[in-house]
Amino acid sequence: MVKLRIRSSQWYDGVDNAPHRPYLRAVGLTEADFAKPLVGVLVSWSELGPCNFHNLELVRYVKEGVKEAGGVGLAAPTIVVNDGINMGTPGMRYSLISRDLIADTIEAQFNSHGVDAWVGIGGCDKTQPGIMMAMVRLDLPAVYLYGGSAEAGWLGERELTIEDAFESVGAYLAGKITLDELKRVEELSFPTYGTCQGMFTANTMATLGEALGLSLLGSASPPATSARRRKYAVESGRAVLKAAELGVTPRKVVTYDALYNAAVTLFATAGSTNAILHLLAIAHEANVKFTLDDFDEISRRVPVIAALRPAGPYAMQDLDRIGGVPRVLKKLYKAGLLRPEALTVEGEPIGKLLERWEPPAVPEAGILYDVEKPYKPYSGIRILRGNLAPSGAVMKIGAADKLRFEGRAKVYDSEAEAFKAVAAGEIKPGDVVIIRYEGPKGAPGMPEMLKVTAAIVGAGLGDAVALVTDGRFSGATRGIMVGHVAPEAAVGGPIALVQNGDRVIIDGEAGLIKLEVSEEELEKRRKAWAPPPPKYKGGLLAKYAALVQQADKGAVTSPSAWGT
């Protein structure tokens, strides 16, 4: 296996490198180990939340698979930011930032220790795209392994996810439930370790890991508590050295066709709008031209076929019971919606893998539908453009009952202001809530608005009120919500010019978001507008605000598509 040690041999072979070897002898390597490929096992782990709590256990099984394949595995950590805990707090500014930090820390760790290949174990919303970005950036043989989602909770016969906890706050504030009922949902909605249970951002990105070909087929859906997690950990350890032998690296996998397949899968599952940002960032790292125009074109041909929360009533564990993500992919493949020649880390095109895969003899039970008779006839997400978002915006329509909305603007310059208004009952049917200065540069960090959106839905206003923001949404968001408005307010985008009472038109079917104000009036407002002073003058947030690009570019911070 000397041919697989192209990198580690430069660090650890020969007389010149004799002083390097004692460092690895001290952590358990033997003389024989120095002749084996060195495989990094990147793990996101933290006790500050359940999403990555169990991932350390998976390291042992990945290393077991690496050993079986003739390599030696050594683990290294990366950071974790728990989105759910930070929702509606100043900490949410660090969420999207952590994605790029994770990619950067992986680059620094593995490029400075000479690993020949690696397996990345991730769990929550930003660890996954951060790991995938690093896979493409480093372009070493690599496999992504998901830690798995938490089991759903139960309140009587009602299946609960964390979405219920957020929406129950709005229901309580609106007087629809008691404090005791809210407390009961809080206690029962997240019963095990693992990630949030619906097709929210974490499960969306795990699903897209399979669609992109960066993960082993079938590895996304088993719950974190399942013994199959350990099985896939061992198999991922074996697979990464097989990929190395075959010369399969992430840049050969993440092609236009792979991104196309990921977009199709995203729309068919009504996944998180955050995935648009993350796929744009992964494409950026791969130096593949894949833009909002591509998402727009694909979205118009793909219906929703999965009844997963928040678009439907089911959790990821329910999809797992009927075959998981491969069952989704096979339906899309048989309908001619996937590009079957896209290569995977398993060394074969995704079409070949799906041809061999057979679903379990379990009825789909309303969890999954055929493309010809879909759950919803339109895609889960639609790209909008218009004078309010010249560079684009993203609307999640799979979890909304209305595709078109017209109303009067109520403008708030922060999420906190908007939440206070919702809690005080100031938001009325027909309002278009505008939350601005929450974009990549303005917040900075483009925080998610789940606290506000869940409060709106919980108050019973989900179909009667729309929300438009230059910030982001949680994957658990539902209702009439438009985010990622670009350009953002902080750089003078038209959203900065909206005033209370302005009429706003949102049309998901036409892909339109329009501010019904004359160009002459907008120009007058533009001349009167001045950029706000930076919220931070030092530290990480200031650095991020200086580097980050707009949402339509994936909110990336890397100045180059090729970071090696």
UniProtKB/Swiss-Prot annotation:
One of its GO terms (biological process) is L-valine biosynthetic process. The active site is at S474. This is Dihydroxy-acid dehydratase. Coiled coil: none annotated. It is an enzyme of class 4 (lyase). Functions in the biosynthesis of branched-chain amino acids. Catalyzes the dehydration of (2R,3R)-2,3-dihydroxy-3-methylpentanoate (2,3-dihydroxy-3-methylvalerate) into 2-oxo-3-methylpentanoate (2-oxo-3-methylvalerate) and of (2R)-2,3-dihydroxy-3-methylbutanoate (2,3-dihydroxyisovalerate) into 2-oxo-3-methylbutanoate (2-oxoisovalerate), the penultimate precursor to L-isoleucine and L-valine, respectively. The lineage of its organism: Archaea, Thermoproteota, Thermoprotei, Thermoproteales, Thermoproteaceae. Binds 1 [2Fe-2S] cluster per subunit. This cluster acts as a Lewis acid cofactor. InterPro entries: DHAD_IlvD/Edd, Dihydro-acid_dehy_C, DihydroxyA_deHydtase, DiOHA_6PGluconate_deHydtase_CS, ILV_EDD_C, ILV_EDD_N, IlvD/EDD_N. It catalyses: (2R)-2,3-dihydroxy-3-methylbutanoate = 3-methyl-2-oxobutanoate + H2O; (2R,3R)-2,3-dihydroxy-3-methylpentanoate = (S)-3-methyl-2-oxopentanoate + H2O. The keyword Heme does not apply. Belongs to the IlvD/Edd family. Its EC number is 4.2.1.9.
